[in-house]
Amino acid sequence: MMRILFASFFLLPWISSLHAQPLFYQGKTITLIAGTTAGSQYDAHARLIAQHWGKHIPGNPDIIVQNMAGAGSLIAANHLYNLAKPDGLTITSIIPAIYFNQLAGRKEVRFDYPKFNWIGSVDRSDNVIYIRSDTPFKTIYDVRRATQGPKCTATGTGTIGHYMPKLLNETIGTKFDIILG
């Protein structure tokens, strides 16, 4: 009992200064920028988040989705970094491989990826490169030793289909021939 009284004596001055903080998000709207076209995977993620997330944020803000497609989410990432106010009211759902744009030194990159604050992920993607069994390439070492590497395709330079073989070519010396389109 004496310990409780002793602890209370020292804690009382601080307890009186504790009061409810105003709810920052109350009455506000969060804009969730989807870095892809309407109907795409990341647009669907953004709309699912917008539908439910506001209920779990103190102040229960409204959340709207704004599509800002183009350049594999590069337009959305550049917008968030350079134009959106850093007030916690604009967030984005972009293609996770966006950081490869900066690593590759693309001149269109207008952001510093490590300065983005990651909130969370809707899913996890594992990347796999596979090759037909009737080719001479049975292991990654075969691709490294090849005089002419296997062809692999990607829809564009901002995609994981481009960056994964490019990263392997530059880091471990594979010889993937990347065809875009």
Question: Where are each of the predicted segments found?
Answer:
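Positively charged n-region of N-terminal signal peptides that target proteins for export
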Residues: M1-I4
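Sec/Tat signal peptide C-region and signal peptidase I cleavage site
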Residues: I15-A20
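Short N-terminal segments immediately surrounding and downstream of signal-peptide cleavage
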Residues: P22-I33
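Hinge/capping helix and adjacent helix->loop/strand transition within the periplasmic-binding protein
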Residues: I30, K55-I57, H79-T90, I98, ...
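Extracytoplasmic "Venus flytrap"
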Residues: T31-A46, A69-G72, T153-I160
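Stable alpha-helical elements in mature extracytoplasmic
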Residues: Q41-H45, I49, G72-A76, P96, ...
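Signal peptide-proximal N-terminal region
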Residues: Q51-I63
